[in-house]
């Protein structure tokens, strides 16, 4: 061991002894100045056993003399342990690197690619010395990379998954009385819901700060809403549908009595309630997808099973008996 190495070891021991009592002080004091951070790359923690220092930081904080090939830098970690790294400039790659001692630091701290190493500088307190004569010291710290969990419980986190991928997407609110807790879903629905959130399907969930859930509908959902005048989200493939507050009008009550007759070669059902001889007549023999309803009053209407309003193509209204009398038939039975 040569004299220069002995002097460095002796100086390092003195720094360790004089700064051990001030470890917590430095890491909680404003006198510790932050220099820079370095996010580790795979090569920084690989078999090359070297840490590349960004050029702007190296020239600013660790400058080398023109005729100097390298030097030794000493750092103290938050536990008070001293670390010594060989610092030099590589002409082949034109980069500043820390080599000797770095692999041991990586192994002991269990560093991986994506972790961050931070460098600080300060000085050892000495009330008897002038500020410019105080012994300077540098610090090194580390922190692991931020972990990202892609599957979250929707009751505990406010994240956005599966945002719509089409430009005409809209978000529709789901009122609390119609929203089902996530844990109340059967296990099959829970698994399907998590998979769709992770894979980023064309519809998703947004939970804002006040706990109101929103679901993004597809263009087909918007088509139904324009035609039906409703605002209930449409979610496909085993995902429960959450209706909004507005409920479509129900069908008219069933008539109490029904009479059948044949009119113009068509079976006609005459229903009456409360003793009224004239009432609602449904014309049989038509397609169930487009029912025809004959009403003799102008005040009421009802929707077909598809939610379509009865129109001139699917319903006929007779204001009186003149239409039947004109054709030679009477409505009276």
UniProtKB/Swiss-Prot annotation:
Residues 36-145 bind DNA. This is B3 domain-containing transcription factor NGA4. The keyword Transcription regulation applies. Residues 323-333 have a biased composition (Basic and acidic residues). Coiled coil: none annotated. Keywords: DNA-binding, Nucleus, Transcription, Transcription regulation. CDD domains: B3_DNA. Regulates lateral organ growth. Functionally redundant with NGA1, NGA2 and NGA3. Residues 268-333 are annotated as: Disordered. InterPro entries: B3_DNA-bd (IPR003340), DNA-bd_pseudobarrel_sf (IPR015300), LEC2-like (IPR044800). PROSITE patterns: B3 (PS50863). One of its GO terms (molecular function) is DNA-binding transcription factor activity. One of its GO terms (cellular component) is nucleus. SUPFAM superfamilies: DNA-binding pseudobarrel domain. The keyword Transport does not apply. It comes from Arabidopsis thaliana (Mouse-ear cress). It comes from the Eukaryota. It is found in: Nucleus. One of its GO terms (biological process) is flower development.
């Amino acid at each position: 061991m040569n004299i220069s190495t002995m002097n460095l070891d002796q100086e390092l021991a003195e720094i360790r002894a004089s700064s051990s009592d001030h470890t917590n002080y430095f890491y909680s004091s404003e006198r510790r100045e932050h220099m820079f951070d370095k996010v580790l790359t795979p090569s920084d923690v690989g078999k090359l056993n070297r840490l590349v220092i960004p050029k702007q930081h190296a020239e600013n904080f660790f400058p080398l003399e023109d005729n100097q090939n390298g030097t030794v830098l000493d750092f103290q970690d938050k536990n008070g342990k001293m670390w010594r790294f060989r610092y030099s400039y590589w002409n082949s790659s034109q980069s500043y690197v820390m080599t000797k001692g770095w692999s041991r630091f990586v192994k002991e701290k269990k560093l991986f690619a994506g972790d961050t190493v931070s460098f600080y500088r300060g000085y050892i307190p000495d009330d008897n010395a002038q500020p410019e004569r105080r012994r300077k010291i540098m610090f090194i710290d580390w922190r692991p990379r931020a972990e990202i969990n892609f599957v979250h419980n929707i009751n505990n986190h406010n994240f956005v998954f599966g945002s719509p991928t089409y430009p005409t997407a809209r978000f529709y609110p789901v009122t609390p009385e119609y929203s089902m807790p996530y844990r109340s879903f059967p296990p099959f629905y829970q698994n399907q819901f998590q998979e769709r959130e992770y894979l980023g399907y064309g519809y998703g969930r947004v939970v804002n700060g006040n706990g109101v859930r929103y679901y993004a509908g597809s263009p087909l959902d918007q088509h139904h809403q324009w035609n039906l005048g409703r605002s209930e989200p449409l979610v496909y493939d085993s995902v429960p549908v959450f209706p909004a507050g507005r409920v479509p009008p129900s069908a008219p009550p069933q008539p109490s009595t029904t009479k059948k007759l044949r009119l113009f070669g068509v079976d006609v059902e005459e229903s009456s309630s409360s003793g009224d001889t004239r009432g609602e007549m449904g014309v049989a023999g038509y397609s169930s997808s487009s029912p025809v309803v004959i009403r003799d009053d102008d005040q009421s209407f009802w929707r077909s099973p598809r939610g379509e309003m009865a129109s001139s193509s699917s319903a006929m209204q007779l204001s009186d008996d003149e239409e039947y009398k004109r054709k030679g038939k009477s409505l009276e039975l």
